[in-house]
Amino acid sequence: MAGQTPSQTVGPFFAYGLTPELYRYAYRSAVGDRLVQSGTEGERIRIEGRVLDGNGEPVPDAMIELWQANAHGRYNHPADDRTDNLLDPDFRGFARTGTGTGPECLFVFDTIRPGALGDGQAPHLNLIVLMRGLLSHLYTRIYFSDEAEANAADPVLARVPPDRRHTLIAQRDQGPGGVVFRLDIHMQGPNETVFFDV
């Protein structure tokens, strides 16, 4: 009798295969943690954070995928066919990294601040979290602490209970190389990050 293949938890080796440069393998991934090139338009920023388990311990083998709009608020994707927002040929809009090569288990993305999409959504980053023990990947977002007015008007963020919104808002800091936004992703516990059913 034919049936659906049963689901399994995500294993510990997927991040090594999909982010080989981070884990110092000889072959390289086509997708890394840098979304910017020398000609990319927009304000350069760095995103840093950790994935924390239910005990508050950093997860060393999680993988994060990020996709975002460019500085003009347009995605580099065929489904975004708006002509009022310009495409940036030097901005891919997608990146992937793991958490396990440094002592702090940080994920780091070098990118630009995304523009507003024009549909009321505040500038934000879309994330997918994959890690051992999950039956499926999880979707979340990162908003920016210095976009308070735009965040207050965002229709997606407005659906999140006010006492949970802080789990989606990265805090701005000035690092040695420029602007850094920091946000940890909590998988469980009282500070559990809001995940979306997409």
What are these regions (language model features)?
Residues 1-198:
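Beta-strand-dominated extracellular/periplasmic modules and repeats
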